[in-house]
A protein has these predicted regions:
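Repeat-blade elements of multi-bladed beta-propeller folds
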Residues: 31-35, 85-111, 125-152, 178-212, ...
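Aromatic (tryptophan-biased) beta-strands that constitute blades/sheets of beta-rich domains
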Residues: 30-93, 100-103, 120-127, 158-180, ...
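Bacterial N-terminal signal peptides
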Residues: 13-23
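Conserved SAM-binding strand-loop segment of SAM-dependent methyltransferases
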Residues: 505-518
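A short glycine-rich, Lys/Arg-flanked "PGG" loop and its adjoining helix->strand segment in the class I
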Residues: 538-550
């Protein structure tokens, strides 16, 4: 909404500069690429004149953006409003306009060309995946990239393919943002310049990311550059002799246009928006809506100012922020060293501005409900044009203004005096032939066996796309809630895609993949929940199906559950196992490969600084703790299966607490302590099966575990867990000597009824973070001193706890005390932990030693508490403000790792990697906050990015250009590694913020060598 006032700040002859600026733009009156030109200025010399009227509207389907919304704020930065999305270029189709045509791509795999004057479809062409960035028109051709990993040139006249090239390696497809995609998707807008098409391929450096130059005439590769640890996302920008390559949510990079050589990072605001005009560059929008301006040369001064969008002519910048649109005199701004304060010519208040462009003598501003036309020289409003949904993108030429809306509509406005035209035709869905659509034999039974709601289905049924096949596809689409992939021959692909698109299914619920005769389907293993196949494809169906219980194959009409993966690890408790080992038994041998990415994003997740409960994983299910509930995700393809609300369930500062969630080993049941009730949830459907009240009046459930098929729990004061959020509280919990959460009783809930089989109260306190179980025994530290006995808060410091404490072993069957040993441990000032594995009990503690954390580890026999060995170490990182003093050990079959030290489990002697001459310690190669997890052959942790450390050779492998959570969220489970998103509220420059999963054991990703241009 535009408010009815305008502020004219400068009264000098500004319009002369505006006119000169338009003259410099030349007579260009088309919009052939995103934001109008190769510099992404969002300005064109000529636009439609006079009063505009609505001319036509076309429906493109509901957009499906790749990335979720950002977090709802940041405690650490004291930001109490939603963060700005920094990689949101596909919120709706972005149209381009040239030669009387409007062309756009959609997330429904379509490229469509419509007549600019009538909106009538001239042609449409389908890609193998979503088209997330605007096409580019040049020389009578339409150049487009897609998530199928291909760059194509289409004839503007009829949409026929002129050439098609895959710049990245030809690798099996994976699950990406809920779709079947190439592991090397085209996630930058193409730049066409001087007969060259510049493009990127790839999103995850682990799989390889590349910058390429292709000959616009025939698609021949001119040169190729490997980008390293870069995730190219956004529109490529022409910067004269250079290219700006956006890096997703991080800072953009500068590469030489002639050969792709890396020049430097642009020290600008983070995000995918980049604009060049002359020698100046602008970028943003940052996490809080901030644009940065600077000259392109190295070392130039950078100035930041509030803004989310801008349009730039040679003389004027139009800046749009969340409150207003401003016209800035660029020469005055340069004279002021980039400060916009003294360069404002006019400004107009805008509520909810979303897009801004310049077309001729007008500025067009899109908002939630209208497009407003203003005079470029004064800001006076000429006209307001109503629209049905928020404006995402605008484009214009001399005859029309085109607006793309958030609901998928594209609406055009033309001068009122233009010749009347017929409206665009409505998209008609062809009727299905009469008769009830029947699911193929066995599919209904397969769906019952899954009983898990949303998921992925695959049809491998025989060749030929006749009427019967169309009916089968319709039956599968209408008779299940699965997202289906149909494997067809190359000759059938376009027709099947067209059929599915006409029904509104392509993209949103269906994909088509080409299968070559006699070859495996080019798709990663174990990606589909239900596979429909014929007997000749049995082996292929089993390869592609998720392991049981989340996978079913229907072969020749018989539904069979896929076999479970016996090697898959499970993370059923806060620290992995009821024994608190922070480890699983699976292998990480082989090469990590991306299996899926997307899943849930940060918008519902708790602020990372609060260090919430670890996600859990078992039986093909991953459970994440959201701010307001729980989210169940498929571990093999990232599909969000279910989401339930758990009001006031979130606990914070989990290093000082015990786990309050537990997942059954097969993922079929979940138990969650929610205030005074213990909720039992069906893991397949997310439905709440039971709410068990606490058996002791006035108490809440504390620690919850499951060992030997029986639940174990603790009872605490309602105020004991940390549940309040505020900057001051988060800041406190990162300091040293913070209190531990404690319970007043241990108990085993009855299987029937709401009582307890046994209860072991204490006059002092049970320390939640030390409670663990194995082999029919329960272990914990019991504090018995005066301060523990007098406490009524449920929180005590380590010093207060260790005033008089003992390690206690209970019989899990009846709660009897089997043994106890006094615990005197002055070194454990900041944290206490207990873990049990293989008959060994591990006591962990830490203290602040100057600016470093000192770690202390003791190994006792679990049978009687006799001490076997003790070890200690010092964190090499001088930093006590990121939780270094609250780490926990990772207990493995042969080794135990405690942050910087790795020790032999039977002797406590330091472990060294092969070839080490002595003095080795484990130092993470990068930021070292958050805890560690592990398996017998490696450790997982944050080192800036999620990283694998291998015991076999002491090597480090970076998994993804993302930020893990601040406690535990890198899980070695399901045959690989799953990383549910837990970095919500991060404002730093990490390119990707999403959940993801990796498989191990396949061959490493092939790396394409750099190819330099021919001399």
């Amino acid at each position: 909404m535009i408010r009815e006032f305008v502020s004219i700040v400068r009264t000098d002859p500004f319009w002369w500069g505006v006119a000169m600026g338009l003259a410099v733009l030349g007579a260009r009156a088309e919009w052939p690429t995103a934001r109008g030109d190769a510099g992404r200025s969002a300005a064109v010399a000529a636009g439609p004149e006079g009063a505009l009227v609505a001319a036509w509207v076309v429906e493109t389907g509901t957009p499906e953006p790749a990335w979720a919304a950002e977090a709802r704020g940041s405690l650490w930065q004291k930001i109490d409003r939603p963060l700005v999305s920094r990689a949101a270029d596909d919120l709706a189709p972005v149209p381009v306009v040239a030669d009387g045509a409007v062309v756009f791509g959609t997330t429904s795999d379509e490229v469509r060309c419509v007549d600019r004057d009538t909106g009538r479809t001239r042609w449409r062409r389908f890609c193998g995946g979503p088209v997330r960035f605007a096409p580019a028109i040049a020389g009578g051709r339409v150049f487009v990239g897609s998530d199928d990993g291909r760059v194509q040139a289409l004839d503007l006249r009829d949409g026929q393919v002129v050439w098609s090239v895959a710049p990245g390696p030809d690798e099996p497809w994976i699950s990406g943002n809920g779709r079947l995609v190439s592991p090397h998707p085209i996630r930058t807008g193409l730049l066409v310049s001087e007969g060259i098409v510049h493009a990127t391929a790839g999103l995850f450096p682990l799989e390889g990311t590349y910058l390429v130059a292709l000959d616009a005439s025939d698609g021949r590769l001119r040169w190729r550059r490997h980008l390293g640890n870069v995730s190219p996302q956004g529109y490529l920008v022409d910067a004269g002799a250079d290219l700006i390559v956006p890096n997703g949510r991080a800072e953009p990079r500068l590469h030489r246009k002639s050969d792709g050589a890396f020049r430097r990072e642009l020290s600008r605001s983070t995000g995918t928006l980049a604009v060049v005009s002359g020698t100046e560059s602008f970028s943003g929008p940052g996490a809080t809506g901030t644009l940065a301006r600077g000259d392109l040369q190295a070392g130039a001064k950078v100035v930041s100012f509030p803004g989310r969008q801008l349009a730039v002519t040679p003389t004027t910048s139009l800046l749009l922020n969340e409150r207003e649109v401003l016209a800035l005199d660029r020469s005055a701004m340069r004279a002021a060293g980039g400060d916009p304060g003294g360069a404002v010519v006019w400004k107009r208040a805008v509520d909810g501005g979303t897009a801004v462009i310049v077309a001729g003598r007008r500025v067009y501003v899109g908002t939630a409900r209208e497009v407003v036309a203003m005079r470029l020289d004064t800001g006076a409003v000429d006209q307001s044009l109503p629209v049905e949904a928020p404006v995402v993108a605008l484009a214009a030429d001399g005859a029309a203004l085109v607006a793309s809306l958030a609901d998928g509509r594209i609406r055009a406005f033309r001068p009122a005096g233009a010749a009347a035209v017929a409206p665009a035709e409505a998209r008609r869905v062809p009727p299905m032939s009469t008769g009830r659509l029947m699911l193929p034999e066995g599919v209904a039974e397969g769906l019952v066996r899954l009983s898990s709601g949303p998921g992925w289905g695959l049809s491998l049924r025989g060749p030929g796309a006749g009427a019967d096949d169309a009916r089968v596809r319709a039956a599968l689409m209408e008779g299940s809630g699965l997202r289906w992939t149909f494997a067809v021959e190359a000759s059938e692909a376009e027709a099947v895609r067209s059929e599915l698109a006409d029904r509104g299914w392509l993209g949103s619920r269906a994909s088509v993949v080409v299968r070559r005769s006699g070859e495996p389907l080019p798709v990663a293993d174990h990606l589909f929940n239900l596979v429909l196949a014929e007997g000749s494809d049995r082996a292929e169906a089993l390869r592609l199906a998720c392991p049981g219980p989340s996978g079913v194959v229907v072969i020749d009409g018989r539904a069979t559950a896929a076999d479970p993966d016996p090697t898959a690890g499970a993370w059923s408790h806060q620290y992995g196992t009821p024994g608190n080992t922070c480890a699983t038994g699976q292998s990480l041998r082989g090469s990590p490969r991306l299996q899926w990415f997307g899943g849930h994003g940060p918008e519902r997740m708790p602020d990372r600084h609060t260090r919430g409960h670890a996600p859990l994983a078992a039986g093909g299910l991953v459970v994440s703790v959201a701010e307001d509930g729980l989210i169940g995700t498929d571990a093999r393809n990232g599909t969000v299966r279910w989401s339930i609300a758990l009001p006031e369930a979130m606990r914070y500062a989990m290093p000082y607490d015990g786990g309050y969630l537990v997942l059954a080993d097969d993922g079929s049941r979940l138990w969650a302590a929610v205030d005074g009730a213990l909720w039992e949830v069906d893991g397949r459907s997310g439905s709440v099966v039971r709410r068990r009240p606490h058996p002791i009046p006035g108490r809440h459930w504390g620690w919850v575990a499951r060992s030997g098929g029986k639940l174990l729990a603790s009872s605490l004061f309602p105020e004991a867990p940390r549940t309040l959020k505020a900057y001051e509280l988060v800041d406190l919990e990162y300091r040293s000597r913070r209190p531990m959460v404690c319970s007043k009783a241990l108990l085993r809930p009855s299987e029937s009824g709401d009582g307890a089989d046994w209860t072991v109260p204490t006059e002092g306190a049970w320390v939640n973070a030390t409670l663990c179980a194995e082999a029919g025994r329960v272990y914990g530290i019991e504090a018995r001193g005066a301060k523990a006995r007098a406490d009524r808060t449920g929180r005590l410091t380590c010093a207060d706890l260790l005033e008089d404490a003992a390690v206690v072993c209970l019989d899990a069957a009846d709660g009897r005390r089997l043994w106890e040993r006094p615990l005197r441990w002055p070194e454990a000032e900041d944290i206490l932990g207990l873990a049990v594995s293989g008959g060994r009990l591990f006591l962990s503690g830490a203290r602040s030693a100057g600016s470093q954390a000192a770690y202390h580890l003791r190994c006792w026999r679990a049978s009687d508490g006799a001490e076997s060995w003790a070890a200690s170490g010092l964190n090499p990182v001088h930093d006590l403000y990121h939780g270094q003093q609250v780490k926990r050990p990772v207990v493995l079959p042969d080794l135990v790792s405690f942050e910087s030290g790795v020790f032999a489990i039977d002797t406590g002697k330091p472990w060294r990697p092969p070839g080490d001459a002595g003095g080795w310690i484990l130092k993470r190669p990068g930021h070292a906050c958050g805890g560690m997890t592990g398996t017998g052959d490696g450790l997982l942790f944050r080192a800036d990015n999620p990283t694998v450390f291998r015991f076999s050779d002491g090597s480090f492998t970076r998994l993804a250009p993302t930020r893990p959570g601040c406690w535990l969220n890198i899980l070695p489970v399901e045959g690989g590694v799953v990383i549910p998103e837990a970095s919500a509220s991060c404002v730093c420059g990490y390119p990707i913020q999403a959940s993801m999963g990796f498989a191990f054991g396949r061959r490493p990703a092939p790396a394409l060598a750099d190819l330099l241009p021919a001399r």
